[in-house]
Amino acid sequence: MSNPDLSPQQIRAALAHLGSLLPPAPMAEMVIIGGAAGVLSGALPASRTTVDCDVLQVSPPEMFDLCRYHAEEVAQRFQIAPQWLDASAHTLAHLMLPGWRDRLVTIGTFGPLKVRAVGRIDLIALKVIAGRAEDLEDLDSLTITHAEAEQLLELFPAIQARGISPQTYAAALEVLSIMRPKNES
């Protein structure tokens, strides 16, 4: 492996090959989050790279197992990290904003695999909650509007009610207050 970082083109090619390895039926829907979702949806700059493709959900569930199984073959073929398809993101489902499924953006259909990314406001919310250095850089690139910050402040209590830790919730509100524009320009 020469470069652990994946460009949007590499991610798209890997997803296309993954789709070609799946059986023709049933159709599967994969929902991605994180940097891959941001660059493939156009919310983040195409120059941004990521080490993986974070999978929030695949339905039907049995297709999730097949995707993970075939991900190793994709990694070998494209000489990318074996963990390029990160299934651990499904543990973040409780952090999704109300209505997130209505805001999904279609990335492409690769054989029987339809790949969708979280919408912009949901991507921003997840980056605010994560609050890591790379997430803060992404938030700078996303240039949060005043209206988006207000929308997040209205929706965040629903996440708190679903079990986010008090420390994580407080940290997310702090990040949002720092990133929040003071007025619309």
Protein language model features and the residues they cover:
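Compositionally biased terminal segments of proteins
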Residues: 1-185
